[in-house]
């Protein structure tokens, strides 16, 4: 059964992270925005895009592959945030806002990945808390 990806908490969390990173990078100077900023925004946006694309695929194997891609994009996002922090582009306040979200998303992606294909044919939210947004 296909999942309405927009209702998955894992997807909503990825959007929250991507939006927070976008707002942060917008305030950087042109050089930082066009180098590290472009990379971190792209990788953060890719997390949710992969969740959405995987949910739209007909086969569980395809969905799992895209969720693995989302995990890779999460790790890439963490890399670029580390670069931004070391280059003094991130404030402690921004780090304090992003870190708990990033720490929450990794396990949620893993749990979502494990749940894909289980209870085939049964109505399922793939192990995620869902909302009706």
Report each predicted region and the residues it spans.
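Amphipathic alpha-helical assembly/interaction segments
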Residues: 1-133
């Amino acid at each position: 059964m296909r999942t309405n990806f927009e209702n998955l908490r894992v997807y909503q969390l990825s959007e929250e992270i991507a939006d927070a990173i976008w707002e942060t990078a917008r305030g950087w100077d042109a050089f930082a925005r066009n180098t590290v900023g472009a990379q971190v925004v792209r990788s953060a946006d890719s997390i949710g895009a992969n969740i959405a694309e995987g949910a739209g695929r007909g086969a569980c194997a395809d969905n799992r592959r895209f969720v693995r891609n989302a995990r890779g994009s999460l790790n890439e996002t963490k890399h670029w945030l580390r670069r931004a922090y070391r280059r003094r582009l991130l404030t402690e306040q921004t780090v304090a806002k992003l870190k708990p979200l990033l720490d929450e998303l990794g396990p949620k992606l893993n749990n979502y990945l494990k749940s894909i294909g289980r209870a085939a044919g049964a109505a399922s939210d793939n192990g995620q808390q869902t909302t009706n947004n």
